Amino acid sequence: MATSVIQFGSFVCNLPKSQPLCTTVHCPKQSMSTNIVRPSDPFAELEKHLEPYLQKRMDATIRQTKGGTLVYKHMSEAKRARKLRKKQREEEEVRLFMNAAPYIVSNITIGGGEVPSKMEEVSIKRPLNKTPSRKIKKSLTPVTFRDGHMNKFLRELRDCATRNSMTVHLIGKRKTELAFKRRASLNAVYATLHHMRGVDRKRDIVLEEWMNDYVLNLSKVSTWGSLFHAESLKRGDSGLILNARALRGKFGRCSRGFFIVRGKSDGVVLDARSKLSMATVTHMEQYSTPEAFWSGLEKKWSVVRKPTAHTCKPTYSVSNCGEVAAIIAQALFPCHKLTCGECSKEICDLTSNECVQELYKNTSLALERMNNLHPEFQHIVKVLSVVRQLTEASNHGTETFDEIFKMIGSKTQSPFTHLNKLNEFMLKGNENTSGEWLTARQHLRELVRFQKNRTDNIKKGDLASFRNKLSARAQYNLYLSCDNQLDKNASFLWGQREYHARRFFLNFFQQIDPSKGYLAYEDRTIPNGSRKLAIGNLIVPLDLAEFRKRMNGIDTQQPPIGKYCTSQLDGNFVYPCCCTTLDDGQPIRSAVYAPTKKHLVVGNTGDTKYINLPKGDTEMLYIALDGYCYINIYLAMLVNISEEEAKDFTKKVRDIFMPKLGKWPTLMDLATTCAQLRIFHPDVHDAELPRILVDHNTQTCHVVDSYGSISTGYHILKAATVSQLVLFADDNLESEIKHYRVGGIVENHKVQIDNQPSRCGVSEFHAIRMLIKGIYRPSVMYELLSEEPYLLVFSILSPSILIAMYNDRAFELAVQIWLEKEQSIPLIATILTNLAAKVSVATTLVQQLQLIELSADQLLNVTCDGFRVSFAYQSALTLLTRMRDQAKANSELISGGFNEYDQDLAWTLEKKLSRPLTRPMERIKLAGKISLLLVLKKAKDSFAVKYQKQKFARCQRNIQFITETIYGKGFLPHESRSSVHQARN
């Protein structure tokens, strides 16, 4: 008998195996009919097709969207792959465990360590030594809140609020207020709307979704069952909540079974929850009452009112008081609505002067209304009269102010400073503050003291006691001591100023040619003499005796101190504008100034400062042109200019001031330009100047550059900064030095001492030449439009040039360049484009010129746009002004039917101006002409072969015209003509 063995630990059990009774079971085979057709599963194919999707859905989870829809959230393919691999690993572990050979389990441990029960410490439990509590614990039944309880709570809340006229707040994202009030002996519920607070909204109230049921429940008071007709609603019913089924008449749409009254529009009562347009909101009748206004007025009136000793009695009617209050409110705070924020903003945006003017105008109008409507309110009339009197403008004397300012505005000495302050005080009038009144009284006191202490026995202008010593302390320049402006060697960093300084070096400096030697540049010729530079000392002899010999200068024998050395203003010396003296009154005479290479030397007090000149394109030395040595003053001012303003500064000097000054300007004109530059660039007021030597023999001021001076004995001007130099620009300054000339060689010079400035800008002839040059050279046109865009205006001088620039798309190019930089230039180009289109349609030259003149006024308004740093700007304004005035003067002749143009003269001028347009090939070389001729001939031949004879004749005439225009009539060679004839045949 076979047995089975089961072993567990040390136990072994032998079990007998029972023999099977029957090992084989025979079943008779049933015969199957082959003719039976089994039905096929209709969903087998569908299930097979959907099997991947259903298998994927087995791993999906269910989630709910914001709309409440339940959807499947499928796993990503990577996550499903990880899950499948994990499942396969688990199945593999189970399979391996089940197929493992039998083994004996002799010990079971946790973590391979000792049994936890053996690790516990045995503790002896002792009873607690305390008195047992006799308190009986009560078990409280938890409060449960059901739907019925909530309805009961709302009913009790509604009854309580109705009895006590309370306000219920429903608080969600926003707060909604429901006020329980009495209306015509019935209880009613009112919702607080936006327009009741003075705020107009498209939706007067916004209820959250959960609030609708609560509002419906709380609104079921005594008015809920009453019928309401649309005509029965009136002011004061805003926010009233009514039963939607109990409404009769014209009512707007509503929802949730209740209607919140807002107002009436076009006879229809509207729900406050409905969204309306702002036009409807503005014009509709809203059923609110001014209770909030009156409650606020009554609340604050008792607090801020004036205390009185008498008993107040009602003398004036309430209606009249309301009208008077409206007049006063409009007089002080003119607005359309008191609650409008835009009206209040308009008042806040007014300046103080505008506010005073509006107050004067409104109080005058209010006084007129009070006298006509309510003259019995005399106290109101008196107060308004006082306000109008205080706000009346008292600063009409601008002509007097201008006259006083012209006489003493530039004077900075007492008592003129006090007079100028009082003049400014009088101009401001009622705008003066209490502090300014106190300051004006102090200035008046100083004037009284001056007049009292003034005596005529003080001797002025006595040169016997004149002393003007040079300060031993050097001028401190922050720009030369700031670490950010210096490199590691403490040298000044020009930065972007170095690039823009090239405008000075390219136009007003020349390179020193070493082949000529330094001696060729040693003599600086002046109209009445010469001055020797120390440039020859750049070659240093090693012989000490020779070097000492070169250190000796050439004395110029200048005169002693005299009136010509001084400058006076009102009898007082202006010391910065005088020559310097020693302690004994003798003039300080200049010594030999040693030369340096590529340095700018500034400062005339103490130790001079040496600044490295901006680097040029080459390593050659530069020297100022004859007559332009004063350019070193502008170069010294450039040190104090910021890098962002360097371009603007250098262009102003080159394009505006240098053409005015030219060669040999007077010191007065030079100081005037410095004063003008100081307005645009205030940082230059303390810029240090180079040494200025005064030559009284030749009445010349020499600006010493880096090459020094061998000529000695000159007087030294004390002015060391720009702010001191501009003192020479005063017409009232009594000085001979201010008429001295500054610079180099003079050519046909005429001293200009009047107040008329020299003309600067570009002539019309040169402007036309530049435009014509740009028409045939796109690069030149681009450069002209980038640097001098106002040259476009000169195209109106000739209709032919205007049309040529239009065809060349020059105006479109100007718009592209300046559209994002300056708005006036694209506008000018647009006007000229439209003008060119009109001119091209005109049939006669006179009509074209008339069209151009009529557009001059519009162009002038657009072009005149403040100060512009442009060489052609002032000339363009002059041209447009002349054409505008000419058009106005000729308007009467045109209206009378007369032609103000001389036909022959107009044709002559137009022919002269447009002549360069018809001869653009005059300067082209012969090779270029031959090349162009071959191109034209090839074009004729190809056209003749391809097209008909009639079309070819037209093409031949056009090409003939182009050729004659370029080369002149009859230029087409005989060979070319014969080839054309053969091609035609």
From Swiss-Prot:
Pfam families: Peptidase_C6, Peptidase_S30, Potyvirid-P3. A motif (Involved in interaction with stylet and aphid transmission) lies at residues 337-340. InterPro entries: HC-pro, HC_PRO_CPD_dom, HC_PRO_CPD_sf, Pept_S30_P1_potyvir, Potyvirid-P3. Residues 621-743 form the Peptidase C6 domain. A motif (Involved in virions binding and aphid transmission) lies at residues 595-597. Potyviral RNA is expressed as two polyproteins which undergo post-translational proteolytic processing. Genome polyprotein is processed by NIa-pro, P1 and HC-pro proteinases resulting in the production of at least ten individual proteins. P3N-PIPO is cleaved by P1 and HC-pro proteinases resulting in the production of three individual proteins. The P1 proteinase and the HC-pro cleave only their respective C-termini autocatalytically. The active site is at residues 195, 204, 238, 629, 702. One of its GO terms (molecular function) is serine-type peptidase activity. The record marks 287-288, 743-744 as: Cleavage. Residues 144-287 form the Peptidase S30 domain. GO terms for biological process: proteolysis; symbiont-mediated suppression of host innate immune response; transport of virus in host, cell to cell; viral translational frameshifting. It comes from the Viruses. Keywords: Host cell junction, Host-virus interaction, Hydrolase, Inhibition of host innate immune response by virus, Protease, Serine protease, Suppressor of RNA silencing, Transport, Viral immunoevasion, Viral movement protein. The N-terminus of helper component proteinase is involved in interaction with stylets. The central part is involved in interaction with virions and the C-terminus is involved in cell-to cell movement of the virus. This is P3N-PIPO polyprotein. The lineage of its organism: Viruses, Riboviria, Orthornavirae, Pisuviricota, Stelpaviricetes.
